[in-house]
């Protein structure tokens, strides 16, 4: 199997993918810094998820839609609001793609 210029499979080095996810804290600058940090760590690719809160959950405040684990960093937060914070705007894709490409990374 081939991904970009890399052969994937037995007797080949692992293909390492960094997940950008919502770790950008709603900042394109942070997102680009994370891409750079991943490249500095030697990853082969960046994976990006884009979703909207509406595609993940309902905008409800009942117990089923609140994080109740007191050990969680997101304790007592509504899922819908949490997904709003983690949302990666579609408009960022091209910029992140170009940064990944400039750094020699594949982009998913």
State where each predicted segment sits:
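N-terminal amphipathic alpha-helix/helix-capping segment at the start of soluble metabolic enzymes
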Residues: 1-17, 93-94, 98
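Hydrophobic faces of well-ordered beta-strands that scaffold small-molecule active sites
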Residues: 16-18, 46-48, 107
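Conserved, mostly hydrophobic/aromatic
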Residues: 19, 38
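Glycine-rich, proline-tolerant flexible connector loops at the mouths of alpha/beta enzymes
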Residues: 26, 44-87
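Aromatic/hydrophobic pocket-lining residues that form the small-molecule binding cavity
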Residues: 31, 89, 93
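Non-catalytic positions within long, well-ordered alpha-helices that form the structural scaffold/packing
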Residues: 39-40, 101
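A structural motif
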Residues: 42-43, 105
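Catalytic beta/alpha-barrel core
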Residues: 82-89, 104-108
């Amino acid at each position: 199997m081939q991904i970009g210029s890399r052969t994937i499979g037995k007797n080949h080095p692992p293909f390492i993918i960094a997940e950008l996810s919502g770790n950008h804290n709603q900042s394109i600058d942070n997102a680009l810094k994370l891409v750079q940090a991943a490249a500095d760590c030697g990853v082969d690719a960046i994976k990006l998820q884009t979703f909207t809160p509406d595609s993940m959950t309902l905008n409800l405040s009942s117990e089923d839609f609140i994080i109740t684990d007191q050990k969680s960093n997101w304790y007592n937060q509504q899922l819908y609001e949490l997904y709003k914070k983690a949302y990666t705007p579609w408009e960022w894709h091209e910029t992140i793609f170009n940064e990944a490409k400039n750094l020699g990374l594949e982009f998913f």
